[in-house]
């Protein structure tokens, strides 16, 4: 198990745009180790997803996967998946709001609205191409993680900064994490 350091909001790397992953890169031992490290880091931090920029790697790589996550009680499981070079297209103007947190913004949450349904095109770690329509909680998770690849944090998407704060304060004043 190799857990990497997660960068925090304020680190300039988190604000940079990531480069696509090439099919040659996915064949390397270094790439395979990076993917293992990303999953180890995500699980250790009890995250639902992790993007490569969060550990200082400016590549378009996201890993997701979560069952019974204590940080987000009552949310559906997210199957493990490796997402490379994603392209997201909103399929509706309808949005849903969710109290989002981030491993790079520890101890805080903010209410973010995102498109309910998206189309996501991506490549997996074997070079297979995918094109899928995604909705619900999974769509929120994928959009949040893929934002990292463009140098965007969820705090950039807050419409109302009064709906942003520390977990403990929000727990007692808004009952959002019951």
UniProtKB/Swiss-Prot annotation:
Name the InterPro entries on file: Peptide_deformylase, Peptide_deformylase_sf
- Naturally occurring in which organism (per UniProt): Leptospira interrogans serogroup Icterohaemorrhagiae serovar Lai (strain 56601)
What residue ranges are annotated as transmembrane? none
Q: What biological processes does GO assign it?
A: co-translational protein modification; translation
Which keywords does the record carry? Hydrolase, Iron, Metal-binding, Protein biosynthesis
Cofactor(s) this protein cannot do without: Fe(2+)
Q: Keyword check for Metal-binding, yes or no.
A: yes
> Which reaction(s) does its UniProt entry say it catalyses?
N-terminal N-formyl-L-methionyl-[peptide] + H2O = N-terminal L-methionyl-[peptide] + formate
The gene designation is def
Q: What is its EC number?
A: 3.5.1.88
Question: What NCBIfam families is this protein classified in?
Answer: pept_deformyl (TIGR00079), PRK00150.1-3 (NF001159)
Subunit note = Homodimer.
Protein name, UniProt field: Peptide deformylase
Residues annotated as catalytic: 145
**Would the keyword Iron be found if you checked this record's keyword annotation?**
yes
């Amino acid at each position: 198990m190799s857990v990497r350091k997660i960068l925090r909001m304020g680190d300039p790397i988190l604000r940079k745009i990531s480069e696509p992953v090439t099919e040659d890169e996915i064949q390397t031992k270094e790439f395979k180790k990076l993917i293992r490290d990303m999953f180890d880091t995500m699980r250790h931090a009890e995250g639902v997803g992790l993007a490569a920029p969060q550990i200082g790697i400016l590549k378009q790589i996201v890993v997701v996967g979560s069952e019974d996550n204590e940080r987000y009680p009552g949310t559906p499981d997210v199957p493990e998946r490796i997402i490379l070079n994603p392209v997201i297209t909103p399929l509706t103007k309808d949005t849903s709001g969710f109290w989002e947190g981030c491993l790079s913004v520890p101890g805080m949450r903010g209410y973010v609205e995102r498109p309910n349904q998206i189309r996501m095109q991506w490549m997996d770690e074997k070079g297979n191409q995918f094109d899928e329509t995604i909705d619900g909680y999974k769509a929120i998770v994928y959009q949040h993680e893929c934002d990292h690849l463009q140098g965007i944090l969820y705090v950039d998407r807050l419409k109302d900064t009064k709906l942003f704060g520390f977990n403990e304060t929000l727990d007692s004043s808004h009952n959002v994490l019951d």
